[in-house]
Amino acid sequence: CACLVGSEMCIRDRYGITLNKLEGIPTYHPDVEVFEVKDADGSQLGIFYVDYFPRSGKSGGAWMSNYREQQGATRPLVCNVCSFTKPVGDTPSLLTMDEVETLFHEFGHALHGLLTKCEYKGTSGTNVVRDFVELPSQINEHWATEPEVLKMYAKHYQTGEVIPDEIIEKILKQKTFNQGFMTTELLAAAILDMNLHMITDVKNLDMLAFEKEAMDKLGLIPEIAPRYRVTYFNHIIGGYAAGYYSYLWANVLDNDAFEAFKEHGIFDKNTADLFRHNVLEKGAVSYTHLRAHETCADL
C-alpha cells in the first residue's frame, strides 16, 4: 500500500524508524501482513500487524489493538485494522483522502503503542486518559496532507505521475470546507454521550425519543444530526463512555502540537525527539515540555 509506505517514510524521516516486512509469520488470516519495527540504532521496537481489507465476518471500521502491551523490557505486538477496498487483479487498493487520513490516524495510534517506554503496561501506549489518547493519532493525520509528504506517496497508480500541485491545493482547501457542520455534529454526539451517562431511570426508556429531546434542547436543526446516533454509537461501549468529547479536545492538542513542527520544519529531528520522548514514550504527562504552555478550551 503506497499510503502505508508514505506513512513509513514520515516516521523514518522523523524518528529514524523502519518497517521490515516479515514472511512466514503465523496470522489469523492470509490478508494480514506483519512488520518488524526497528529503531534508528537497529534495536527492535515491536511487531506491527496490518489487517486492511474487509471480509465476511469481519467488523467494519478502523482501529488499533494490542496483542501484547509494552511493559519494561517486553516489546509490544500492535495491530491496525481497517476496511479499505481490496486489490483486484492488477488494480491496487485505491483510497479516498478520507481513507488515507484514517490510515495515518490509526498508524499514529500504532506508533503510540510501539514507541512507549513505561515500567507498567497499565500506563504504556494508549493506556492513558481519554482526554489525551487521540493526540498521537490525530497529529499524525497532519502529515498525510502536507504537500511535501503527498509528493512522497500520492502517485498515479498506472503512470507513476506524482500528484500535481493543483490537486494538492484542492486537497488543502477541502480540509477546511464545511468545518462548522463537522464540528457541530461532533459536539452533538459528545453531548448526547454525556446525556446518556446521566440517565438515572432506564425503565420504559425510549432511546430515540431521548435522543430527540436531547438534541431539541440544543436547538439542533434537523439537517444536522449527531455524528453517531444512539442506535449505532459504538464508541460509548468501546472505551469512550462519557468521553467522546476527547476527539474534539484532541483537535485542540494536535493543532497546537503540530505548530511546533511547522515552526521548525515538519521533519525537524529535535522537535520529533521532543514529541517522542515527552508524549509517545511517557504518555500524557509531559505535554508542556513540548509546547511550554497549557492548552486552552476557550473558543
Which sequence ranges carry the predicted segments?
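Short, solvent-exposed segments of well-ordered alpha helices
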Residues: 1, 94, 98, 179, ...
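Single conserved hydrophobic/aromatic residue that forms the stacking wall/gate
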Residues: 1-6, 289, 294-299
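Active-site loops and adjacent core secondary-structure elements that bind or stabilize anionic groups
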Residues: 9-10
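C-terminal, non-catalytic "cap/extension" segments appended to globular domains
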Residues: 15-18, 25-31, 44-47, 106, ...
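Active-site-adjacent "gating/activation" loops or surface patches in catalytic cores
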Residues: 28-29, 36-95
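Short alpha-helix carrying the canonical HExxH Zn2+-binding catalytic motif
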Residues: 96-104, 108
